[in-house]
């Protein structure tokens, strides 16, 4: 199958909501070695976000059930074994994506926005790994995630408008990383607030093409800020991860 056929198959898979097939097609496109177009980049991102998202959601549900079965050894063992199965799937998906990023996507990225997009993706998938890791493995995945986010953040600050949806999406996910993974609410709030304020100050630079994406992410930043501020003030609330 040539590149255009693989891309067509990925689009078909997306319409059928068969995201594993979509990811397989876009992985094959990436392994051809050429730099991806914006459309191809987005197809790859959507495919893997759905594939890993389903496992993250399952993992959370099963972990919660596992905790509730304390005192019932047989049920707890069944829940634990099932959680470990989902965990292995999740880890394999993340390692697949990180391998594509390290071998093809980051080295081949020429425009700054592509570099930021892929480094953000690298931060995201190490973050997903860290959610299910423990001990030394957790420390390593957390450090790798932070390093990728930080590198992307520095490029985005110097090369992109504050209203650019990729820069805003990075700020959103990096702030979630500080809040959820590093347990640093002050740093999370500070990062989210700066990104929001800087974008508001330059709203006139928004082009029609990205207006919808940018304003949606700004809304998510504001929602998280409201939530995190109320939580740090001692109010009970569930964290809606506005994860881009």
Curated annotation (Swiss-Prot):
Residues with N-acetylmethionine modification: 1
Pfam family, one: 14-3-3
One BP annotation, GO: signal transduction
SMART domains in the record: 14_3_3 (SM00101)
Record keywords: Acetylation, Cytoplasm
Major localization class: cytoplasm
InterPro entries reported in the protein's UniProt record: 14-3-3 (IPR000308), 14-3-3_CS (IPR023409), 14-3-3_dom_sf (IPR036815), 14-3-3_domain (IPR023410)
Tagged with keyword Protein transport: no
Residue(s) at site: Interaction with phosphoserine on interacting protein: 56, 127
GO CC term, one of those recorded: cytoplasm
Localization in the cell: Cytoplasm
Superkingdom per UniProt: Eukaryota
Family: Belongs to the 14-3-3 family.
Stated role: Adapter protein implicated in the regulation of a large spectrum of both general and specialized signaling pathways. Binds to a large number of partners, usually by recognition of a phosphoserine or phosphothreonine motif. Binding generally results in the modulation of the activity of the binding partner.
Quaternary structure, from the entry: Homodimer, and heterodimer with other family members.
Protein name: 14-3-3 protein beta/alpha-B
Organism: Xenopus laevis
């Amino acid at each position: 199958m040539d590149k255009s056929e693989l891309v067509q198959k990925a689009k078909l898979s997306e319409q059928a909501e068969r995201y594993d097939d979509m990811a397989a097609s876009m992985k094959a496109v990436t392994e051809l070695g050429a730099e991806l177009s914006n459309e191809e980049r987005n197809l790859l991102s959507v495919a893997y976000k759905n594939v890993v998202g389903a496992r993250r959601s399952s993992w959370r549900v099963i972990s919660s059930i596992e905790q509730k079965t304390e005192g019932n050894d047989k049920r707890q063992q069944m829940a634990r074994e099932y959680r470990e199965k989902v965990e292995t799937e999740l880890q394999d998906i993340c390692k697949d994506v990180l391998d594509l990023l390290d071998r093809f996507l980051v080295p081949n990225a020429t425009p700054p926005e592509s570099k930021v997009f892929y480094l953000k993706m690298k931060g995201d998938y190490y973050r997903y790994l860290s959610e299910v890791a423990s001990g030394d493995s957790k420390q390593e995945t957390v450090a790798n995630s932070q390093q990728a986010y930080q590198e992307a953040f520095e490029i985005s600050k110097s090369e992109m408008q504050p209203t650019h949806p990729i820069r805003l999406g990075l700020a959103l996910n990096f702030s979630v990383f500080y809040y959820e993974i590093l347990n640093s609410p002050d740093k999370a709030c500070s990062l989210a607030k700066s990104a929001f304020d800087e974008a508001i100050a330059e709203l006139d630079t928004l082009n029609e093409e990205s207006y919808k994406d940018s304003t949606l992410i700004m809304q998510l930043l504001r929602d998280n800020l409201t939530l995190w501020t109320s939580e740090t003030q001692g109010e009970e609330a569930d964290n809606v991860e506005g994860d881009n």
